[in-house]
């Protein structure tokens, strides 16, 4: 990514998919879709300029492969609506270049986009955001950041909203993320939280931007 602002503009575009999931469970996808698979909500968005294939597996498993060093996608499984839950996941995440593995989602009233980043590729998404402290949770330390998006895509259409980030210093793929610890730490840092309503989903997301790689994640 060339800059934090341009990166987030592209990443934020990934959440424009409808908050109302389709009734049909789809397995292998190459175009944007939301729905339910194996009892979990899934969201897959791609800008169409790279080569990306998303697959819904059994229960909470999904996989995604991408190539071509072009484009942006966001994909994963989780819950709609989200909640203060302990998220346990396992699997593999192998980006060649820029990519994120995170617990990702939205809050409303106020509108907030959030990331709890477990691992990333060549670009740390907190590089150009405002650092607000740290939080220790689930055996690791996370740096807290805040940024604002102005007239950007969201689950409520074009809007101005804050982004909250927790980025793990010790990268890992697999474990439990106690989301309440992050939400509480954000509040203590002066960041106003919203509610889990009006399509405010939560997924364990794989994201890629102008890169290649593979990811196979199971949400438990």
From Swiss-Prot:
Principal EC category: hydrolase
Sequence ranges assigned to domain GH11 in this UniProt record: 28-220
Pathway connected to this protein: Glycan degradation; xylan degradation
Catalytic reaction list: Endohydrolysis of (1->4)-beta-D-xylosidic linkages in xylans
UniProt entry tagged with the keyword Membrane: no
Any one GO cellular component localisation term in the record: extracellular region
Activity regulation, short description: Divalent cations such as Ca(2+), Zn(2+), Mg(2+), Cu(2+), Co(2+), or Ni(2+) at a high concentration (5 mM) slightly decrease the catalytic activity. Fe(3+) shows strong repression. EDTA and SDS also inhibit the activity.
Record-listed E.C. numbers: 3.2.1.8
Signal peptide: 1-19
Active site, per annotation: 113 (nucleophile), 207 (proton donor)
Biological function: Endo-1,4-beta-xylanase involved in the hydrolysis of xylan, a major structural heterogeneous polysaccharide found in plant biomass representing the second most abundant polysaccharide in the biosphere, after cellulose. Efficiently hydrolyzes different xylans including beechwood xylan, birchwood xylan, or oat spelt xylanand; as well as xylo-oligosaccharides (XOS) except xylobiose. Xylotriose, xylobiose, and some longer XOS were the main hydrolytic products. Xyn also partially degrades xylotriose to xylobiose and xylose, and the longer XOS (X4 to X6) are also efficiently hydrolyzed.
Annotated family: Belongs to the glycosyl hydrolase 11 (cellulase G) family.
Name of the protein this chain belongs to: Endo-1,4-beta-xylanase 3
Organism: Penicillium parvum (Eupenicillium parvum)
């Amino acid at each position: 990514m060339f800059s934090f602002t341009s990166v987030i503009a592209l990443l934020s575009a990934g959440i424009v998919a409808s908050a109302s999931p389709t009734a049909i469970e789809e397995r292998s996808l190459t175009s944007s879709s939301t729905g339910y698979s194996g009892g979990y909500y899934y969201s897959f968005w791609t800008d169409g300029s790279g080569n990306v294939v998303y697959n819904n597996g059994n229960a909470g498993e999904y996989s995604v492969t991408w190539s071509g060093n072009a484009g942006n996608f966001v994909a994963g499984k989780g819950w709609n609506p989200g909640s203060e839950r302990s998220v346990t996941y396992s699997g593999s995440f192998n980006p060649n270049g820029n990519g994120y593995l995170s617990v990702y989602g939205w809050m409303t009233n106020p509108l907030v986009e959030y990331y709890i980043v477990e691992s990333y590729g060549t670009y740390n998404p907190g590089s150009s955001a405002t650092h607000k402290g740290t939080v220790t949770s689930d055996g690791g330390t996370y740096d807290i950041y805040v940024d604002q998006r102005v007239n950007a895509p969201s689950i409520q259409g074009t809007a101005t909203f804050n982004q909250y980030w927790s980025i793990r210093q010790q990268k890992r793929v697999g474990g439990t993320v106690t989301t309440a610890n992050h939400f509480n730490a954000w509040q203590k840092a002066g960041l106003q939280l919203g509610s889990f309503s009006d399509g405010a989903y939560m997924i364990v997301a794989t994201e890629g931007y102008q890169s290649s790689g593979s990811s196979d994640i199971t949400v438990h």
